């Protein structure tokens, strides 16, 4: 591999590394969406919530003269509950809606697949750098691109999850906005998917410019 192409590969891997960090941050944090309830003038507190792939947290925030509940960063009584995705027979005290839990389980499972693709891609990159096996960059690029697509699907599932929660009559929340964990997931998709495609492009062997070039460059037979 030429020096110019190697430089492009290193820059691409750096972008992919940033995407990996953002993907990990999005998966382990619970600020994908912030939910706000309908405001009642006679209430002294309001209950806002934020949630991610693994748990939902509600916070009772003292009300002031504003017409909105929050922001979520204000001090208040906080209560978090894990979704308990893979423990049948157990249910969350807060997350009582079967359909909503199915959305969350799907998003979490897809995110785990994404992390698996990231691990496989990273192993291929490490093996290629260790013994100059440049051909391993090609499967690595595909793994990273698949990881990005999984993140995108997880983002869409969570988006539908939030919409379903807001539209449900069983919840008190009527307003929402996507928070920084959601932004990390979107940025991770862009970096992983485009980085994977760029890595595949840079790792492909150079095509001959002329039909006879490959024959002229071939080693003579003995």
UniProtKB/Swiss-Prot annotation:
Membrane topology: Multi-pass membrane protein
Residues exposed to the Extracellular side: 30-108, 156-179
Segments crossing the lipid bilayer: 11-29, 109-129, 135-155, 180-204
Pfam entry (one): Claudin_2
Gene3D superfamilies per the UniProt record, alphabetical: 1.20.140.150
PTM info: N-glycosylated.
Tissue localization of expression: Skeletal muscle.
Role this protein plays: Regulatory subunit of the voltage-gated calcium channel that gives rise to L-type calcium currents in skeletal muscle. Regulates channel inactivation kinetics.
Protein's name according to its UniProt entry: Voltage-dependent calcium channel gamma-1 subunit
Naturally occurring in which organism (per UniProt): Homo sapiens
